[in-house]
Amino acid sequence: SMSTCEVGSGFKQAVKNDVRVTKIGKFIRSTSIDELPQLFNVLVGEMSMVGARPHPIALDDKFSKLIQNYMSRYKEKPGITGLAQINNCRGETDTLEKMENRIKYDIEYSDNVSIYLYFKILFLTPIVIIFNKNVY
C-alpha cells in the first residue's frame, strides 16, 4: 500500500496525504483491506481477531516511557481490531494525548475482556470502517 522509504530511515508513521501511499494503497488502506494478511497470524495463534493493535517497536519504546501502564495493553494477544478502533482511535497518533486515549481503550479491553465484548467489537468494526474516514 506504500512505497518503500530510504534504507536506515527508521520507522515513520503514515500521515494524512502521505506521499508514500500509492493510489491503490489509498483505497486498500481506507477500506482496511491491508489488514487481511494478519488473518494468517490469527490462524497460527500469534494474534487474536480482537485485542490491542500491535505498535512498531519504536512506538512501544517511546510511549512505554511516557504513558503509565503502557505495556499492560499486551496482557492479551494483539488483535486486528480492538476497543480503541471502534472508538475512532484509528490513524495517526501524532500527539501524546491521542496515544494516551488509544492506550486507555486497549487497557480497558484487557481489564474487561469477555466473550460479549469480543463479539461486540467484531460486530462494530465493519460499521466503523465504513463510516470512519480517519485512516490513511
Language-model-detected regions and their locations in the chain:
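Conserved small/aromatic sequence motifs within transmembrane helices
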Residues: 1-136
